[in-house]
Amino acid sequence: MNLHEYQGKQLFKEYGLPVSEGYAADTAQGAVEAADRIGGEEWVVKCQVHAGGRGKAGGVKLVKNKDDIRAFAENWLGKNLVTFQTDENGQPVSKILVESCTDIANELYLGAVVDRTTRRVVFMASTEGGVEIETVAEETPEKILKAEIDPIVGPQPYQAREMAFALGLSGVQIKQFTQIFLGLAKMFEELDVALIEINPLVIKTDGNLHCLDAKVGIDGNALYRQPKLKDMQDPSQEDAREAHAAQWELNYVALDGNVGCMVNGAGLAMGTMDIVNLHGGKPANFLDVGGGATKERVAEAFKIILSDDNVKAVLVNIFGGIVRCDMIAEGIIGAVKEVGVEVPVVVRLEGTNAELGREVLANSGLDIIAAESLTDAAQKVVAAAEGK
């Protein structure tokens, strides 16, 4: 789950990190009032969306009067911002962040992520701030510094100091960098963070370090123990189908193909997508209904798949271990009747009560295509999607 910049900076402030004074507003008048609270003669206004590249798309602007703040807010609120990280539809802008200006002498990068290979949190820093870190990693990987956090002893000040020296910091800057490093590490652990980026972490003209941006991603699997963070979720920034699926505890990821897939188990779901590809099809989604799927969840999963207009056929691939195939069959029948399915549906059932499940489907009177094997299912659904 991603947070907006203003939300990330609120958390930074709670953990003692230096951030600009700023307030988020959802109206043009609110944006002007935010500037009044901040004071001064110059401000930065930023569209709040879950995507990078806002500046190049016109979503970040330096303004010198409140009329420009009002005009910026009126122009963007309620519209979609399209950047190189969004699709052609962009992301809806429902809030504008108004901040005080910062005089910048230099830009750095500081981030932290879970390295699944080493199974540790890894901090990364670079002198190439304000640039996409992926670009730096590809073109000049030697400019990225790394520090692994030992889960037993935790983050150590010496790791921050080594990084600070390598970044060319000196004097009080090293102490400030160490405080930021340790604050981020504490926040990462306590809030179940999956990703943090400060890009750029700037050196101001007065020599002090300052967090000019905040990108924070929370581990969605840990939200049950982070109620405060769960309340920060902005469903408008997510794929509508994915957000709907999450409410039903369904693991759904939208793709760009035309074969809808409903499977129980993440591994089987990926294998199903692979075999659909192998036979010339393109999956429209990843959808894992889970081992404890109920009839209601299966019906809801069907609705979510069919809400994608690109879907020309649906493949249901169920291995009955914990879940019973006859229950899945009843869910399929219920969904087909309720939604009014107009595309071919191919079903492959194996495992617990598979024979009973196939019997339930056969006696339903619905035009459902039965498959004897996974290969057979893939061939049939690809052919059906092509109208053969």
UniProtKB/Swiss-Prot annotation:
It is an enzyme of class 6 (ligase). Substrate binds at residues 264, 321-323. The keyword Chloroplast does not apply. Binds 1 Mg(2+) ion per subunit. Its cofactor is Mg(2+). Pathway: Carbohydrate metabolism; tricarboxylic acid cycle; succinate from succinyl-CoA (ligase route): step 1/1. Signal peptide: none annotated. It catalyses: succinate + ATP + CoA = succinyl-CoA + ADP + phosphate; GTP + succinate + CoA = succinyl-CoA + GDP + phosphate. Keywords: ATP-binding, Ligase, Magnesium, Metal-binding, Nucleotide-binding, Tricarboxylic acid cycle. Heterotetramer of two alpha and two beta subunits. Succinyl-CoA synthetase functions in the citric acid cycle (TCA), coupling the hydrolysis of succinyl-CoA to the synthesis of either ATP or GTP and thus represents the only step of substrate-level phosphorylation in the TCA. The beta subunit provides nucleotide specificity of the enzyme and binds the substrate succinate, while the binding sites for coenzyme A and phosphate are found in the alpha subunit. This is Succinate--CoA ligase [ADP-forming] subunit beta. It comes from Alteromonas mediterranea (strain DSM 17117 / CIP 110805 / LMG 28347 / Deep ecotype).
